[in-house]
């Protein structure tokens, strides 16, 4: 299973047929094994010559070629390797190839492709083992954070911290640092309140200061002979925590900065994958010389990095960077990947620039893509359990880990994820945040089924169900939200600590400061008794029905053209039902589930003044960015999560005034908020003024 789509679900009969095919092929492989035994009398020179010939043959064919020729090459490569191996090694490799092929077929892949891939994996693993041993000259630095993070933490410290998280006694040692217009918060968990004082941040380094694999250094211009590439201010903030395996929640400044942080995390992922694989291969060689050694270097399954993105266009950018930085030219199924993920089309130029960026290219949000890295090739659409990196959307992964058919559910391939990235979380939040929460519910769990793993080499913290303490989670978003904070605070428990950025917004750079429109803007605060986030929607609704609705019914301003903007769909349903059942207000509504007829009809009626109030949801605005006409006043049930939306809503009034439909001296904007809306308020009014609005003595504040 490499990529999931609407055609990727297979029935049980076909799956069983594939397994029978694999079994028959397994028998055929053993026949080939007997033939291979007869070749053991050949000299080592002949075996090496045969291997070189096989390698040259493979190099003469394009990466995407399929068919019998490729399969015969795979068999030939396998037989050549078998001829040079001892009996135990040969049988072990055959068993592994059979297991991989059966697993792939069970997951829904074509039997012939599954067999071919399994044989190629076996041959390639042997080649990689030799190459990894040839790299023994790459001495791991003493401060290699890969080794420090995963191998040098005592079991006692891990157990103590794990217990502290479970019983709620874990605390954080915190250090704050101001960097221009942003504050960086460094924190590290400790098992008790003792020792919460002390330095947290490790001194900054350049990219060269980290133990990056030599082949990555050479390909990306990071060797001592190359001129040092200057880092951007954003990269300087991210470099150290990223390569020191700390969790990150980062709010980047503009959409044009996305490539900066992606270049870093894709290089980090490649370095992690290469180090993991090379260490396993080198240890394989060590165990052949001394089988009694205890070398713990593995997880339950192979996948080590998970990248979650909102659309195929973003996935294409991420995978393209991984391919560029890998230094590997041979990429299997690259043209198929481009056909399915790349789209040069752009949104209409009339839409806002942020909309054009978010919705450019292929906006499909249903995909899961496996990537397997070897020394000489990258295989796209690889079986999940044979992949090193998985790039997916929340929806695509959701339909695998929470499949309605329990027999088809899979989440074991997430058991050993060590680096996780959530890219463009602000866009993902407009899809379905429940899918993101489900990913965290399934990641780093002990597998339900026994996979092809050597338990004598699985790290103890995997077996002890402590993998979450070692997983690095990096979240990148345009705007930090309460949901983003909750992910970091409740779903992440990295022993190495975490880094969080907070962008300070000056009054001049706030939305109100840059609006350029003299308009009466009223912010009304309501109190949440007890301060519970669970009860906040009820207090907001009560304030709206008792204070705002009577004002609409007895307004001294415009009696039509009132746009009621509601961010949450559950709040929208609640308000709509109340206005319908408890009031006589003539209203209409448009939301993300409205059909085109309803959208067109209600917008026209609102423009003509035949309905007084129009209910409008934030998700609909995010996905469509309508140019609503006839807006004379705006009521925000809650501050928008994206400050650009606030500006766009107010411009509706500006356009009405320009057309002579509204008077700016009469039109008003009213925004309801509580102390829990401070993040959204900061971006609208500025950081200092938001503090006044949320903690000041007054409950009503007005700007013009």
Curated annotation (Swiss-Prot):
Q: Which GO terms describe its biological process?
A: maturation of SSU-rRNA from tricistronic rRNA transcript (SSU-rRNA, 5.8S rRNA, LSU-rRNA)
- One Pfam assignment: Utp25_C
Localization, UniProt: Nucleus, Nucleolus
Output a single Gene Ontology CC term carried by this record: nucleolus
Gene Ontology MF annotations: rRNA binding; U3 snoRNA binding
Question: Which stretches does UniProt call biased (Acidic residues)?
Answer: 100-113, 125-143
* Record-linked Gene3D superfamilies: P-loop containing nucleotide triphosphate hydrolases
The record's keywords, sorted A to Z, are: Nucleus, Ribonucleoprotein, Ribosome biogenesis, rRNA processing
Name the InterPro entries on file. P-loop_NTPase, UTP25, UTP25_C, UTP25_NTPase-like
Region (Disordered), start-end ranges: 1-143
Q: Which domain of life is it from?
A: Eukaryota
Bias-annotated ranges (Basic and acidic residues): 30-45
UniProt keyword rRNA processing present: yes
Is ATP-binding there in the keyword field? no
State the family it belongs to.
Belongs to the UTP25 family.
Quaternary assembly: Component of the ribosomal small subunit (SSU) processome composed of at least 40 protein subunits and snoRNA U3.
Q: What does this protein do, in the record's words?
A: DEAD-box RNA helicase-like protein required for pre-18S rRNA processing, specifically at sites A0, A1, and A2.
Under PANTHER family, the record lists: ORF PROTEIN-RELATED (PTHR12933), U3 SMALL NUCLEOLAR RNA-ASSOCIATED PROTEIN 25 HOMOLOG (PTHR12933:SF0)
In Swiss-Prot or TrEMBL terms, this protein is called U3 small nucleolar RNA-associated protein 25
Originating species = Eremothecium gossypii (strain ATCC 10895 / CBS 109.51 / FGSC 9923 / NRRL Y-1056)
């Amino acid at each position: 299973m490499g990529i999931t789509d609407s055609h990727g679900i297979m029935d049980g009969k076909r799956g069983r047929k594939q397994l029978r095919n694999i079994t028959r092929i397994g028998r055929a492989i053993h026949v080939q094994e007997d033939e291979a035994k007869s070749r053991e009398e050949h000299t080592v020179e002949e075996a090496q010559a045969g291997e070189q010939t096989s390698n040259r043959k493979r190099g003469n064919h394009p990466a995407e070629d399929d068919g019998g020729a490729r399969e015969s090459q795979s068999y030939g490569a396998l037989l050549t390797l078998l001829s040079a191996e001892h009996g135990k090694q040969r049988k072990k490799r055959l068993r592994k190839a059979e297991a991989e092929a059966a697993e792939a077929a069970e997951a829904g892949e074509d039997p012939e492709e599954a067999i071919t891939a399994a044989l190629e994996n076996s041959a390639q693993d042997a080649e990689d083992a030799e190459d990894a041993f040839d790299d023994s000259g790459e001495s791991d630095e003493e401060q290699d954070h890969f080794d420090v993070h995963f191998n040098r933490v005592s079991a006692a410290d891990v157990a103590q911290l794990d217990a502290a998280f479970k019983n709620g006694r874990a605390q954080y040692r915190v250090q704050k640092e101001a960097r221009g217009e942003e504050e960086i918060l460094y924190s590290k968990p400790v098992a008790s309140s003792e020792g919460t004082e002390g330095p947290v941040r490790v001194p900054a380094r350049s990219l060269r200061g980290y133990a990056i694999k030599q082949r990555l250094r050479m390909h990306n211009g990071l060797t001592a002979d190359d001129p040092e590439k200057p880092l951007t201010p954003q990269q300087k903030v991210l470099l150290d925590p990223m390569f020191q395996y700390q969790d990150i929640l980062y709010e980047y400044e503009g959409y044009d900065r996305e490539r900066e942080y992606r270049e870093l995390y894709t290089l980090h992922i490649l370095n992690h994958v290469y180090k993991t694989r090379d260490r396993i291969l080198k240890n394989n060689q060590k165990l052949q010389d001394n089988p009694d050694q205890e070398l713990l270097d593995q997880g339950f399954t192979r996948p080590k990095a998970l990248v979650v993105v909102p659309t195929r266009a973003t996935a294409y950018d991420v995978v393209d960077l991984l391919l560029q930085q890998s230094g590997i030219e041979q990429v299997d199924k690259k043209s198929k990947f481009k056909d399915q993920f790349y789209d040069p089309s752009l949104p209409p130029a009339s839409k806002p620039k942020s909309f054009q960026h978010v919705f450019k290219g292929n906006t499909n949000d249903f995909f899961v893509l496996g990537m397997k890295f070897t020394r000489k090739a990258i295989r796209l659409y690889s079986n999940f359990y044979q992949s090193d990196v998985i790039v997916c959307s929340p929806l695509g992964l959701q339909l695998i880990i929470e499949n309605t058919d329990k027999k088809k559910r899979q989440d074991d391939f997430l058991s050993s994820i060590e680096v996780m990235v959530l890219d463009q979380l602000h866009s993902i939040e407009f899809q379905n945040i429940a899918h993101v929460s489900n990913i965290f519910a399934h990641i780093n769990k002990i597998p339900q089924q026994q996979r092809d793993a050597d338990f004598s080499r699985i790290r103890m913290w995997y077996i002890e169900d402590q993998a979450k303490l070692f997983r690095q989670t990096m979240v990148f978003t345009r705007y930090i939200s309460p949901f983003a904070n909750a992910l970091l605070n409740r779903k992440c428990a990295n022993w190495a600590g975490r880094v969080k950025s907070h962008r300070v917004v000056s009054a001049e750079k706030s939305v109100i400061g840059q609006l350029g429109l003299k308009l009466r803007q009223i912010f009304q605060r309501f109190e949440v008794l007890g301060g519970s986030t669970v009860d906040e929607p009820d207090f907001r609704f009560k304030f709206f029905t008792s204070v705002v609705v009577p004002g609409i019914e007895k307004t001294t301003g415009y009696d039509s053209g009132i746009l009621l903007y509601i961010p949450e769909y559950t709040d929208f349903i609640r308000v709509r039902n109340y206005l319908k059942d408890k009031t006589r207000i003539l209203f209409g509504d448009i939301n993300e589930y409205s059909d085109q007829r309803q959208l067109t009809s209600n917008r026209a009626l609102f423009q003509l003044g035949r309905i007084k109030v129009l209910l409008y949801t934030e998700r609909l605005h995010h996905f469509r960015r309508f140019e609503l006409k006839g807006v004379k006043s705006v009521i925000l049930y809650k501050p928008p999560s994206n400050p650009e939306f606030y500006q766009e809503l107010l411009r509706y009034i500006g356009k009405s005034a320009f057309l002579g439909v509204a008077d700016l001296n009469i039109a008003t904007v009213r925004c309801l908020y509580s102390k829990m809306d401070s993040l959204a308020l900061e971006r609208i009014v500025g950081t200092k003024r938001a503090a006044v609005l949320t903690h000041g003595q007054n409950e009503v504040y007005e700007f013009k």
